Amino acid sequence: MSILSNIPGKKFIILAHCLLNQNTVVKPLASHVGVVSSLIQFITEKGYGVIQLPCPETIYLGLRRWWMSREQYDTVSYREFSKRILEPYIRLVEELVRDGCEYIVIGVKGSPSCAVRVTTSNQCWSGEPRVDKCPPPVKISSPGVFMEVLLEMIRRKGLKEPLELLEIDHDEVAAKGLPDDVCRVLEKYSPIK
């Protein structure tokens, strides 16, 4: 039995890596210096624990990678790589859930890897990114490949599903602050009332 098992409402957030480390965002798409501080401040004030996922794109391709679409990451080798680096995180989630914790997943809107609802798609992109030769990318209703693998692993383990799947748009937060819908959900499930 956990020492903290008498604390009501234990909750944590599984967080896309770049929300706590903007240095890993594809250049020049980072929107904050260091961290998305308004989000981090909000979730810590509301009493959530945080599991920061690794940045799959940086580990897989490094910091000098091009911007890419979901289709470019949707390969057998990237999915296997994602499973391999997620395995210890799934074990951690399993332990926390077994101890009575509930959780929320926060991804990055538009990310080909870390979106949970809306990702970037471009069937034409391959090879050198020549925007003049292809139509512009579009946003589609689909998780990014890495988050899709995460959610599949959670289901395969038979773990309790996340309370919510939320997305943060870096640029929107930089321009307007945290979206009201994200704040409402985090308030709703906050361990601190």
PLM feature spans:
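Short, well-ordered beta-to-alpha junction loops that form the rim of enzyme active sites
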Residues: 108-112, 170
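Divalent-metal-activated hydrolytic enzyme cores
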Residues: 63-70, 75-91, 97, 128-193
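Short, surface-exposed acidic-centric catalytic microdomains
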Residues: 29-73
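A short acidic (Asp/Glu
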Residues: 25, 62-63, 114-119, 178
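Short, solvent-exposed loop/turn segments at secondary-structure junctions
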Residues: 20-21, 57-58, 112-113
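Short glycine-rich phosphate-binding loop at a beta-alpha junction
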Residues: 102-108
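Active-site and ligand/interface coordination hotspots across diverse enzymes
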Residues: 1-29
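A glycine- and small-aliphatic-rich helix-loop capping segment at beta-alpha/alpha-beta transitions
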Residues: 120-130
